[in-house]
């Protein structure tokens, strides 16, 4: 029916119910289907391209790296030096600063896609992905919405499935008593762009992770009055120690020292640079920052100026929320704050359980299959960007996934060629 570099429509009617033939187009992919055109998906695709393995990238948005383009605030910079955030086989340009802005990172990702000629199928949302045990193949059902074609349904049939949607696909919005009666502006941090609209306002920031800290700092810089809700203990580290990235310093020390000693060293240096954060309402966990990251996946906050604002009182630390009322919030310690706006820096979660049937991703997850094999599941299922190790970890996983798929693809292709050659010889011998 049709053929191109990445996909070919073939006769697979034996896999379909009669109603499927008329309700959706079925496409055979002679390689993996990659779900997600963010950094993880692009990295896998580029390495597959380099090894001449065909693939298809499915992306629900109308652009690559949609979370970076649509759900990040204007002042955002990468928290780690650029060498730890670049994707495989194409470094950042030399003129990019050590900590690129979000715009520089997006431009880098777009140039990465152009360099490797990666062409995702945009506006195509995966509805379900299920492994067909009878045929040993994945069935990925999608919906395409476009001005040109309107509403179309597709089913991709493939041997390998790469889940690269990441852990931040959907916003986490907790329920709070009385929030519907608050009457003021309520926004998730994923929709926050700048503090300009909050100038002169009293803003409650719910959450004290990296997003909560940066939003609070940005609000201060725009003459707003932020109060940050801190419900649990948190590790705050300086972004740099004596001009060297804290992350890079940690990586270097980990080569020679056990985790507990690296943690001890980091906390001593942090105490010298930031002081005792406990007295400002930021209590530290009993477990060290790296051990906590490894065991619970909780990332430490890298300070870029919020701590000095907390010390000066410009950012106020407050207890957990009891309930909201009209124009106010009551805290668990009994205090009542009059506020104008609420920003929910309450994080994100994966949307994979909603479309990957039978919760197959659980077979890959860090809990059941820890690093370094956390990227590989069963029956040709792979995941990139789910091991909680940021962009550097995702790039490492991407290369592992691409290499593993390429080896399988080349072996299966070789076997198919042998089978065809054997049949051809038989035809000649009977001629």
UniProtKB/Swiss-Prot annotation:
Superkingdom to which the source organism belongs: Eukaryota
Classification via InterPro entries? Auxin_biosynth/cation_transpt, FAD/NAD-bd_sf, Flavin_mOase-like
* Name this polypeptide is given: Probable indole-3-pyruvate monooxygenase YUCCA7
- Pathway linked to the protein: Plant hormone metabolism; auxin biosynthesis
GO BP annotations listed: indoleacetic acid biosynthetic process; response to water deprivation
Which EC main class describes this enzyme? Answer: oxidoreductase
Binding-site positions, FAD: 36-41
Gene deletion effect: No visible phenotype, due to the redundancy with the other members of the YUCCA family.
Concerning its family, UniProt says: Belongs to the FMO family.
| Record's note on what induces expression | Up-regulated by drought and by abscisic acid.
**Cofactor(s), names only, from the UniProt record:** FAD
Protein function: Involved in auxin biosynthesis. Belongs to the set of redundant YUCCA genes probably responsible for auxin biosynthesis in roots.
Pfam families annotated for this entry? FMO-like
What's the catalysed reaction?
A: indole-3-pyruvate + NADPH + O2 + H(+) = (indol-3-yl)acetate + CO2 + NADP(+) + H2O
UniProt note on tissues of expression: Expressed in shoot apex regions and siliques, and at high levels in roots. Detected in flowers, stems and leaves.
Its Gene Ontology molecular function terms?
A: flavin adenine dinucleotide binding; indole-3-pyruvate monooxygenase activity; N,N-dimethylaniline monooxygenase activity; NADP binding
């Amino acid at each position: 029916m049709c053929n191109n570099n990445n996909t070919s429509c073939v006769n697979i009617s034996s896999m379909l119910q009669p109603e499927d033939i008329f309700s959706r187009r079925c496409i055979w992919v002679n390689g993996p289907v990659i779900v997600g055109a963010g950094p993880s998906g692009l990295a896998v695709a580029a390495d597959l391209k380099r090894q001449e393995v065909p693939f298809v990238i499915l992306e629900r948005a109308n652009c690559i790296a949609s979370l970076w383009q649509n759900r990040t605030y204007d002042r955002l910079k990468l928290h780690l030096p650029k060498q730890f955030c670049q994707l495989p086989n194409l470094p950042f340009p030399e003129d990019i600063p050590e900590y690129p802005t979000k715009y520089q990172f997006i431009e880098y990702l777009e140039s990465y896609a152009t360099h490797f000629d990666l062409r995702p199928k945009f506006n195509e949302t995966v509805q379900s992905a299920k492994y067909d045990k009878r045929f040993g193949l994945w069935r990925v059902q999608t919906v395409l919405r476009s001005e040109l074609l309107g509403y179309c349904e597709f089913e991709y049939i493939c041997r390998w499935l790469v889940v690269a949607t990441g852990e931040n696909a959907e916003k986490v919005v907790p329920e709070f008593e009385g929030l519907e009666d608050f009457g003021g502006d309520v926004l998730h941090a994923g929709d926050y762009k700048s503090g300009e609209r909050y100038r002169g306002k009293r803003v409650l920031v719910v959450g004290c992770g990296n997003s909560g800290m940066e939003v609070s700092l940005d609000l201060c810089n725009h003459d707003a009055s932020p109060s940050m809700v801190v419900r649990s203990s948190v590790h705050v580290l300086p972004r740099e120690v004596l001009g060297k990235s804290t992350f890079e310093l940690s990586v270097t020390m980990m080569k020679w020292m056990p985790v507990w000693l690296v943690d001890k060293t980091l906390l001593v240096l942090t105490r010298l640079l930031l002081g005792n954060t406990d007295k400002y309402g930021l209590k530290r966990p009993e477990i060290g920052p790296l051990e906590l990251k490894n065991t619970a996946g909780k990332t430490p906050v890298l300070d870029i100026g919020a701590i000095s604002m907390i010390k000066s009182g410009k950012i106020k630390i407050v207890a957990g929320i009891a309930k909201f009322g009209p124009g106010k919030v009551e805290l668990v310690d009994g205090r009542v704050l009059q506020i104008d706006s609420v920003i929910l820096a309450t994080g994100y979660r994966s949307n994979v359980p909603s479309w990957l049937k039978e919760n197959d991703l659980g077979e890959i997850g860090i809990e059941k299959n820890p690093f370094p094999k956390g990227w590989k599941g069963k029956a040709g299922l792979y995941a990139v960007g789910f091991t909680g190790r940021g962009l550097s970890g995702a790039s490492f996983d991407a290369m592992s996934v691409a290499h593993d798929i390429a080896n399988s693809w080349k072996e299966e292709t070789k076997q198919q060629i042998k089978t065809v050659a054997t049949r051809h010889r038989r035809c000649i011998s009977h001629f």
